[in-house]
C-alpha cells in the first residue's frame, strides 16, 4: 500500500545513510505485481545508490513467485532464494526462500557452502524457529513479516506467537533484528506502531 511518492521518500532517506548494501526481507509485492507496474515502482528501487538484495516473503508467493521474480528483476534487486553471496570483504549474505515454500532448503544444507570464517548475515522473511540460525552459527539474522502488529493491540498477539515479533534479540553468539518494515498491509494506516528502516553498522 505504499505509493510511489512514499517509496521515493524512503529511498531518499536510505540513500542519505550512504549504505554499502540495502537488504530487504521480502514482501515487496502484495498479491499482485500490477499496481507496482502501473505506478512505475521499479524505477524507485533502481534509485538506490547501493546494491539491493532481498529474499521472498509470503505475499510475494501470493502474487505468484514467477510474477514476483519478474518485478524484482525489473527493480534491479538481487533476489536470493536459498543462495549465498559475498557482499563485502569478509561478509556473506544468505537469503532463504520463504517458508511458504515447503520444499525450501534446510538452513544447515545452505550453510555447508558458506565459509565459516566470514561474517554471515541471514535474510529470512518470517521470524519462526530463531534457534535454527543460532545452531548454524549465523552471526546476524534479519527478518520482517510481522509489521510489529501494525495496529495495536495486534502487536500483543504477535508477541505471543513469535519468540521475537519486533526489535533486537541475542541468542548465544547470534544477533537478530525483526523489523516492522516500511510498508503496511490491509488498512492504509498504523496505530501504535511505526514504519522503519534499520541501519546495521558492522565494526
Regions found by a protein language model. Name each.
Residues 1-203:
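Soluble catalytic domains of enzymes that build or remodel membrane lipids, polysaccharides, and related
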Amino acid at each position: 500500500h505504499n505509493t510511489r511518492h512514499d517509496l521515493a521518500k524512503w529511498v531518499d532517506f536510505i540513500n542519505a545513510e550512504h549504505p554499502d548494501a540495502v537488504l530487504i526481507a521480502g514482501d515487496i509485492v502484495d498479491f499482485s505485481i500490477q499496481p507496482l507496474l502501473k505506478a512505475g515502482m521499479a524505477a524507485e528501487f533502481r534509485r538506490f545508490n547501493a546494491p539491493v538484495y532481498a529474499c521472498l516473503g509470503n505475499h510475494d508467493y501470493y502474487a505468484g513467485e514467477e510474477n514476483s521474480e519478474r518485478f524484482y528483476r525489473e527493480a534491479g534487486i538481487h533476489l536470493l532464494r536459498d543462495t549465498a553471496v559475498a557482499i563485502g570483504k569478509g561478509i556473506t549474505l544468505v537469503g532463504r526462500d520463504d517458508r511458504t515454500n515447503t520444499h525450501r532448503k534446510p538452513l544447515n544444507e545452505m550453510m555447508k557452502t558458506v565459509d565459516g570464517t566470514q561474517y554471515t548475515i541471514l535474510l529470512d522473511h518470517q521470524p519462526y524457529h530463531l534457534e535454527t540460525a543460532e545452531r548454524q552459527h549465523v552471526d546476524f539474522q534479519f527478518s520482517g513479516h510481522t509489521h510489529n502488529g501494525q495496529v495495536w493491540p495486534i502487536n500483543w498477539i504477535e508477541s505471543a506467537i513469535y519468540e521475537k515479533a519486533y526489535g533486537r534479540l541475542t541468542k548465544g553468539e547470534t544477533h537478530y533484528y525483526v523489523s516492522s518494515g516500511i510498508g503496511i498491509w490491509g488498512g492504509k494506516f498504523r496505530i501504535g506502531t511505526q514504519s522503519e528502516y534499520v541501519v546495521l553498522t558492522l565494526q
